[in-house]
Amino acid sequence: MANTAQAKKRVRQNIKQRERNSGLRSRLRTAIKSVRKAIVAGDKNLAETVFRKSVSIIDSIASKGIIHKNKASRHKSRLSGAVKAMG
C-alpha cells in the first residue's frame, strides 16, 4: 500500500496509464484482425484500404511506446506480404 503522497499519486497515474495503454493495445489488435478478415474474405481492394488505415494505427501506437518499433515493423511487414500475396 502506498504510504507517501508521491506513491499515492503514482498509483493513480499508473491506473490511468494502464487503462489508456490497454485501450490502445485493443485498438491495435482490432486493426490487425480487420486486415486479416478482409484477406480471408478475398476482397483485395478492401484489404488494401484497411491495411493503410491499420499501418497508421500501428505506427501511432509504436510512437507512443505501447509496442516496440520492431514489433510494429513486423506486423506491417507480415500484413503487407499477406495483402500482396492475394494476387
From Swiss-Prot:
Keyword tRNA-binding: no
Protein name: Small ribosomal subunit protein bS20
Tagged with keyword Ribosomal protein: yes
Signal sequence, start to end: none
Annotated region described as Disordered, given as residue ranges: 1-26
Function: Binds directly to 16S ribosomal RNA.
Record key words, sorted: Ribonucleoprotein, Ribosomal protein, RNA-binding, rRNA-binding
Gene Ontology MF terms in the entry: small ribosomal subunit rRNA binding; structural constituent of ribosome
Gene: rpsT
UniProt cross-references to SUPFAM superfamilies, sorted A to Z: Ribosomal protein S20
GO biological process, one term: translation
UniProt record similarity statement: Belongs to the bacterial ribosomal protein bS20 family.
Any one of the GO CC terms: small ribosomal subunit
Organism: Nitrosomonas eutropha (strain DSM 101675 / C91 / Nm57)
